């Protein structure tokens, strides 16, 4: 049986009169790719902030080892592109020995050697996302949290991104927790899907998302159309 790395038990969070999440319970299993989906304002960011320890629950319990090392890739990375700095120099600032052990493990797979002399500002969206992922694994995390990583990426870059995620998980033995709104790619690439809209609407494994299933109907009620996206093992 797989070990759980995060467990939410009846967790609620209030900010004044607002309650972005209410009585939320779920488990993230070790070495799985778990994806949290939901509409804007569903409470996804609140969940991430609770996992990171930036917020405390108003009620309920979060079971997570605070010694757990987390690599976090925010929706907006916040790196200015005005400064003319190359990929190599940027990574050197974060890992002085350049291409530390983890980055070396994946550098050939993500073509870092090919782009390392390019300026950050000249990278495509897909190339920049690879650099961001390299940053997130420098400290050898147990858990990687990715907030809307597919945003602004074209279909080809999305496919390359997921190939990289699967490679990193296997090579470095990392658990992945992802926020996304793209149900089709989620179904194809996740071990577990959790649907949130202030509370847990449904959760399960991708092959359970079949036409007219309870899972599928719950997703459809939130605007996630599943009838074209049957997933078969």
UniProtKB/Swiss-Prot annotation:
Keywords attached to this Swiss-Prot or TrEMBL record, sorted alphabetically, are: ATP-binding, Cell inner membrane, Cell membrane, Ion transport, Membrane, Nucleotide-binding, Translocase, Transport, Zinc, Zinc transport
Give the highest taxon in the source lineage.
Bacteria
Enzyme Commission code? 7.2.2.20
ABC transporter domain: residues covered: 6-222
What reaction does this enzyme carry out catalytically?
Zn(2+)(out) + ATP(in) + H2O(in) = Zn(2+)(in) + ADP(in) + phosphate(in) + H(+)(in)
Q: Which GO terms describe its cellular component?
A: plasma membrane
GO molecular function terms attached to this record = ABC-type zinc transporter activity; ATP binding; ATP hydrolysis activity
Per the UniProt entry, the signal peptide is none
Cite the binding residues for ATP: 38-45
Task: Output the GO biological process annotations, alphabetical, semicolon-separated.
Answer: response to zinc ion
Q: Where is the protein situated, by its record's location annotation?
A: Cell inner membrane
How does the UniProt record describe the way this protein sits in the membrane? Peripheral membrane protein
Identify which top EC class this enzyme belongs to.
translocase
What does the subunit section of this Swiss-Prot or TrEMBL entry state?
Answer: The complex is composed of two ATP-binding proteins (ZnuC), two transmembrane proteins (ZnuB) and a solute-binding protein (ZnuA).
Q: What function is annotated for this protein?
A: Part of the ABC transporter complex ZnuABC involved in zinc import. Responsible for energy coupling to the transport system.
Q: Which family does it belong to?
A: Belongs to the ABC transporter superfamily. Zinc importer (TC 3.A.1.15.5) family.
Please state what the protein is called.
Answer: Zinc import ATP-binding protein ZnuC
Species the sequence originates in: Rickettsia typhi (strain ATCC VR-144 / Wilmington)
Q: Kindly list the organism's lineage.
A: Bacteria, Pseudomonadati, Pseudomonadota, Alphaproteobacteria, Rickettsiales
